[in-house]
């Protein structure tokens, strides 16, 4: 156990639960319902546009309410398709609410960290009920003492307000005694680091060339390519 660290904040999407797998499944079914032909390469467009929108949310340029109206309108436009983007967003969220595909070794590492007596907290951007239901469906919710989701916190990662909302639940715990673990360099790593937390970047893609995005490894305190590597840190 790392005696310096007391509280672990773990991102959900593409850290504990495979958002990409769930989103591709949901997109396929959404297209089927809308009478559109889905091809796997279309998911690449969804990922690109979805990531751009979330980046703007993280920068404070868009809100979660904006996401509801613009995500599928934008994706459909880039695919050259016509459909009701708002209705597709509703169906996509309904399906995503049901999606709970664990990232490899996620449950094992949660069990390990729980036995090490760390205080485990989920820290995620997104709709509260959706994220809680997905953790519950994956049998992961039981490991967390707190679940901080942006919709309920009232602020998004990487804002200081989000981390303020988390830390107010802990009396006598310093940011330096906390670690933020996640796949996003902006929301998780930059957000945690700016708040004074230790950080661990999980490269969900497993692409070791991704370290080049991390300023030669100088942004995050730790970089891992598999969740099991946390055992070498904590």
Regions found by a protein language model. Give the residues of each.
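N-terminal helical cap/lid subdomain that shapes the substrate entry/recognition surface
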Residues: 2-104
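Short glycine/serine/threonine/alanine-rich loop segments
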Residues: 36, 118, 197
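Catalytic-core regions built around general acid/base machinery
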Residues: 105-117
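Asp-based, Mg2+/Mn2+-dependent phosphohydrolase catalytic module
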Residues: 1-8, 21, 83, 111-114, ...
């Amino acid at each position: 156990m790392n005696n310096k660290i007391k509280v672990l904040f773990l991102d959900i999407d593409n850290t504990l639960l495979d958002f990409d797998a769930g989103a591709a499944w949901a997109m396929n079914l959404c297209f089927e319902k809308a009478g559109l032909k889905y091809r796997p390469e279309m998911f690449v467009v969804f990922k690109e546009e979805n990531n751009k929108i979330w980046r703007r949310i993280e920068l404070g340029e868009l809100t979660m309410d904006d996401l509801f109206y613009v995500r599928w309108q934008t994706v459909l436009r880039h695919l050259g398709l016509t459909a009701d983007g708002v209705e597709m967003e509703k169906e996509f969220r309904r399906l995503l609410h049901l999606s709970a595909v664990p990232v490899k070794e996620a449950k094992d590492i949660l069990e390990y960290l729980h036995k090490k007596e760390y205080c485990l907290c989920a820290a995620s951007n997104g709709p509260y009920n959706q994220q809680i239901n997905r953790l519950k469906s994956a049998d992961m919710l039981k490991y967390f003492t707190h679940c901080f989701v942006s919709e309920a916190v009232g602020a998004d990662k990487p804002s200081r307000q989000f981390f303020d909302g988390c830390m107010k639940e802990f009396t006598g715990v310093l940011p330096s005694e906390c670690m933020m673990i996640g796949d996003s360099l902006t929301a998780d790593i930059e957000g945690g680091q700016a708040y004074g937390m230790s950080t661990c970047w999980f490269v969900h893609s497993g692409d070791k060339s991704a370290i080049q995005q991390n300023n030669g490894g100088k942004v995050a305190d730790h970089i891992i390519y598999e969740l099991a590597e946390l055992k070498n840190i904590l």
